[in-house]
């Protein structure tokens, strides 16, 4: 399943039951589960998937023609990527 991206989460009866995917050739397909859906796409990717799924602030979602499924006002707000840089230097003088 390389070169495949998640377009949105499939929600049925207010429960996440799977994901809709797009492969490198543009073909759409669904993957469903009987257990749980874990979203882990980073600081920018996770809110993007949630918003495309209809999860987030109603006004922003409906403006883009996406059916609103769950009100969650904080989605897509306060976006920050938490970059870290480690520098090690050997000191030759005390």
Regions found by a protein language model. Give the residues of each.
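Glycine-rich loop(s) and the adjacent beta-strand/alpha-helix scaffold that form part
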Residues: 5, 9-94
């Amino acid at each position: 399943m390389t070169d495949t991206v998640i377009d949105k989460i499939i929600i049925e009866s207010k429960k996440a039951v799977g994901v809709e995917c797009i492969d490198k050739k543009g073909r759409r397909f669904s993957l469903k589960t009987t257990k749980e859906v874990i979203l882990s796409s980073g600081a920018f990717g996770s809110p993007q998937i949630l918003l495309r799924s209809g999860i987030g602030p109603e006004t922003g979602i409906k403006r883009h023609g996406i059916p609103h499924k769950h009100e969650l006002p904080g989605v897509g707000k306060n976006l920050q990527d938490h970059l870290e840089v480690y520098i090690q230097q050997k000191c030759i003088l005390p």
